[in-house]
Amino acid sequence: MTTKLISSLSIFFALLAALASTNFLSQHTLFLKHLLIHFNPQTLLSSLPFIVPTPIPFGCRHSHHHHHHHPSDERKTTKTICDDFPPDFPPPDTNTTSIFCVDSNGCCNFTTVQAAVDAVGVMSPKRTVIWINTGIYFEKVIIPKTKPNITFQGQGYTSTAIVWNDTANSSHGTFYSGSVQVFAPNFIAKNISFMNVAPIPGPGVVGAQAVALRIAGDQAAFWGCGFFGAQDTLHDDRGRHYFKDCYIQGSIDFIFGNAKSFYEGCHITSIASPVAPGARVINGAVTAHGRASKDENSGFAFVNCSIGGTGRIWLGRAWRPFSTVVFSYTSMTDIIAPEGWNDFNDPTRDL
């Protein structure tokens, strides 16, 4: 068994374990279908250093059924994986927009998202739409600050995902563990998921923080996106950001950073371990905002959102002295601890 096959299998099972920790797969069977298609036996066997022969169909050698083969039969039945792909896609560039296409099967410009990002012109004033076909893309993606005005256009957050498994330990710090890291301004993502499938840490484990997305560029927007992880899932680092109709999953401080961000209509799901009825255990928190000074103009606002899942969690922990988080018109299940907030063991951070 080769290293490549072992890696493929380990990522496959890590992804299944991460998603099985909630009822996500039962609610989104389409995503499970794409996951199984991506890791079909042919894909896994292709990791082996030899060619797997095509099996001979049973009964071919001694069949008494007489079938006259015509050359045209093969033309009618032969079909490639790219046959259903639009022949004229992506369209040509315009004065304001370029469209790149990513498909893991090689049906268009690029097979990886990072390759498409690398092809974007430095400091291009045009918007570059990177259209990402249905699939699971196992790669770490970085958009440097010299690549502004990029859009990631997926085909649905349950069918298109960028996945990696770094942790604070493996990447020299939490801030660098993100599966996708965006430092450029004017970034947009639509209908795509960002996942970190590192193992869910046990109590007291050090260095297991695992970011799915770090957004550190100004004026970013996310529509219909998914963010999957456990501790520190979404690093809403700095800048002004808008999240609309997104799905955000985690356990501890899973929306954290010092950005000025507005979350509208988002579904927030805790995957903290279940807590027995009546127990006073707290084992998670939704937010950890990092406003360090009253002069900083930052904070998280959640409007018309919903919070559910498992565990007994706080709405937030005051990561820095002036942490600012507001929940408005947001429904919450009884997983939220009655006290609501935690001052990080520093009473001066209480209002």
Description of each model-found segment:
Residues 2-351:
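Sequence-level preference for short, compositionally simple segments enriched
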